[in-house]
């Protein structure tokens, strides 16, 4: 029987009524307090998530705002209304970001590779390098095949063939004799072994052609010259070999190894500072590039199917092919890995440069995706130099597009030639804006297509090249993640014989029962076991 409620308590809140199973009922005040506590806890979790991913959100917002601002300024008159001086001032914040990123590329690449190569055993270094190059080669071949298949299926150049004469006449520029395939590979080998390390920091070797008159006949003559741009391939090779040499020195090389490691750590601190300026720079980089275009609508209307083919291929390769390869080998969620590198991907879209994205990519794969420093700082600089999945796919689409444009059929031999040449030439593509277009002429020459049609590709390269850069840096990151998984499995296999030997020496029956009194090392946790949430994970590196 329930007692009468006391005075001042007409609803009987002071009385505790038993429930059906005899347990006392929960106090409503305690319920409200628990609800408030859960609400505060969820707010804290949301706040921690926002704080941890603030740079990602700011970068994505900057990209969207840059597109909106560029379209708004273009609608108000664009570059003609601004004038040359105001256009330069409008693009200045983005130019400043590019200069800051390029400033730290040289010390970051050299120091990270020297330290990474010196920290690895030469045999392990060879295995890691071989696996990395194999992964990059296979993914580039897959990207090339995907590009050719999409271009043959969607026929982007067939509908555009009727408009070819008018657009080619308005957009064509004077063409210099194009580079031969053999000379391109020889230039690649020359750049691997630079004659001067100081000049390799800002120049690279290239072969150009001049037409000279010999007895009334015009002959293409190769001429060697140094072109502006860092010879990053030569610096990468030198840094790796130099790091191996320091390891061979033993104790005598330790001070120099510590110097390069400290230099690299200080450079990463600079990277973390620069990244907070990145959203501002990306906003104006994207906006200024859209403003510089004469008529974005006309370009999309005339070359829309070609753009769609390139972007669709990049989306399939970046969202399906690369994640599927990562999942098949690691059995881990690839899209969680992608979320960890979302900021570098947005940076790649804004800067359109694999090399400029390298510092932030190193920071994110180490801190957010758990890749060891010696792996990321060894694999990522190599990937930024030789892994160009996006460029290979775009070059294959462009080659098939130009063939359809000129009503030239592609037989099986020519398709294989496009695949092989695109895969090989993408290795030599510079990690700079429009680097893939520079090597497209090699593919066109290999299948006897007119190089003059590159002017059409250049008209929309400002958009396609940004998509290429995203795929390039994503492939580098997945390569580092796969190598980290390979190293982890190798270490586990190396420790298994020791564990088996220890277990066989002690019979199971002689072990004490794992209770609290007999084993003081056991401690019961009050909370439930499980992984921490993705937003609560922090780096311990």
Swiss-Prot record:
Q: Which organism is it from?
A: Oryctolagus cuniculus
What protein does this entry describe? Neutral amino acid transporter B(0)
Query: Which GO biological process entries does UniProt record here?
Result: glutamine transport; L-aspartate import across plasma membrane; protein homotrimerization
Keywords attached to this Swiss-Prot or TrEMBL record, sorted alphabetically, are: Acetylation, Amino-acid transport, Antiport, Cell membrane, Glycoprotein, Membrane, Metal-binding, Phosphoprotein, Sodium, Symport, Transmembrane, Transmembrane helix, Transport
Compositionally skewed regions (Basic and acidic residues) per UniProt? 1-10
Q: Which reaction does it catalyse?
A: L-glutamine(out) + L-serine(in) + Na(+)(out) = L-glutamine(in) + L-serine(out) + Na(+)(in); L-glutamine(in) + L-serine(out) + Na(+)(out) = L-glutamine(out) + L-serine(in) + Na(+)(in); L-threonine(in) + L-glutamine(out) + Na(+)(out) = L-threonine(out) + L-glutamine(in) + Na(+)(in); L-threonine(out) + L-glutamine(in) + Na(+)(out) = L-threonine(in) + L-glutamine(out) + Na(+)(in)
Q: Which residues are glycosylated?
A: 164, 215
In Gene Ontology terms, what is one molecular function of this protein?
metal ion binding
> Which family is this sequence assigned to?
Belongs to the dicarboxylate/amino acid:cation symporter (DAACS) (TC 2.A.23) family. SLC1A5 subfamily.
Indicate where the modification N-acetylmethionine is found in the sequence: 1
Q: Which residues lie on this side of the membrane: Extracellular?
A: 83-95, 155-225, 287-307, 402-414, 449-461
Localization recorded for this chain is: Cell membrane; Melanosome
Positions that bind Na(+) 2 = 385
Q: Which residues lie on this side of the membrane: Cytoplasmic?
A: 1-52, 118-131, 250-258, 330-334, 366-374, 484-541
Q: Where, by residue number, does Na(+) 1 bind?
A: 383, 387, 472, 476
Q: Which residues cross the membrane?
A: 53-82, 96-117, 132-154, 226-249, 259-286, 308-329, 375-401, 462-483
Complex and partners: Homotrimer.
Q: What does this protein do?
A: Sodium-coupled antiporter of neutral amino acids. In a tri-substrate transport cycle, exchanges neutral amino acids between the extracellular and intracellular compartments, coupled to the inward cotransport of at least one sodium ion. The preferred substrate is the essential amino acid L-glutamine, a precursor for biosynthesis of proteins, nucleotides and amine sugars as well as an alternative fuel for mitochondrial oxidative phosphorylation. Exchanges L-glutamine with other neutral amino acids such as L-serine, L-threonine and L-asparagine in a bidirectional way.
Q: What's the encoding gene here? A: SLC1A5
Q: Which domain of life is it from?
A: Eukaryota
Q: Keyword Acetylation, does the record have it?
A: yes
Intramembrane residues span 335-365, 415-448
- Is Transferase tagged as a keyword? no
- Where does the protein principally reside? membrane
Q: Name one GO cellular component term.
A: membrane
Disordered, as annotated region: 1-32, 493-541
Q: Which residues carry this modification: Phosphoserine?
A: 495, 504, 539
